[in-house]
Design a protein with these regions (language model features):
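N-terminal periplasmic "start-of-domain" segments of outer-membrane beta-barrel proteins
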Residues: 1-12, 16, 40-43, 59, ...
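Short, conserved catalytic or interaction motifs in soluble domains
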Residues: 10, 30, 89, 109, ...
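Short beta-strands and strand-coil junctions in structured, solvent-facing domains, enriched
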Residues: 14-15, 32-33, 49-52, 68-70, ...
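A general structural signal for stabilizing positions within well-ordered secondary structure
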Residues: 15, 22-25, 75, 94, ...
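Short acidic/polar hinge/loop motifs at secondary-structure boundaries
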Residues: 64-90
Length: 180
């Protein structure tokens, strides 16, 4: 089956500072992701399903083989990834329904078997927006042929604008994600 595919490695994702689906579209030609108030609108090569909450997305995201096809579910951060594969065009033969526009396939990093405990942590701060983001992962060998990996991220932000009427900053963010 002929496929148009672009693959970004986990190291490349970190180097480019890609932290969410919206920033991914800056580096993949033909992919447009717009964040609305409560969901993403995803278009690949101009094909998408728009903002109708009753429809599944025409471009489906897969995380470790599990389909995520509602726009609200795309809000999860890109956490501890080995690679992201972007397959353009209809992918119904390989991935099934709701893939008429294409597929964004995310593969999580696997634990290291037989090695030592491995940790990675990062802290990002944007003082002018009162934003703090902490991310980390640990790979723990349990035996010579079994290991586990735990990854987590937390982000807090007071927002990037000031509402004079309510006398507060916004829109605020407070999110946590954990994968084991």
């Amino acid at each position: 089956v002929p496929i148009s595919i672009q693959v970004l490695s986990g190291d490349k994702i970190e180097d480019l500072g890609i932290t969410n689906m919206e920033s991914l579209s800056n580096y993949v030609p033909g992919l447009m992701i717009n964040k609305g108030a409560a969901q993403f609108n995803i278009y690949m090569r101009g094909v998408g399903s728009g903002t109708n909450k009753g429809f599944s997305q025409s471009v489906t995201q897969f995380i470790d083989g599990m389909a995520i096809n509602r726009g609200e579910q795309y809000l999860a951060p890109m956490l501890d990834l080995e690679r992201v594969e972007v397959l353009k065009g209809s992918q119904g033969v390989l991935f099934g329904k709701n893939t008429i526009g294409g597929v964004i396939n995310m593969v999580s990093r696997s634990p290291e078997i037989g090695g030592e405990a491995d940790t990675t942590w990062s802290i990002e701060s944007v003082p002018e927006w009162s934003t703090l983001k902490l991310s980390g992962a640990v790979s723990i060998p349990v035996s010579d042929n079994f290991a586990m990996r735990i990854a987590a991220t937390h982000e807090e932000s007071d927002g990037w604008t000031y509402n004079a009427l309510l006398d507060e900053d916004g829109p605020t963010t407070d999110s946590t994600a954990i994968r084991a």
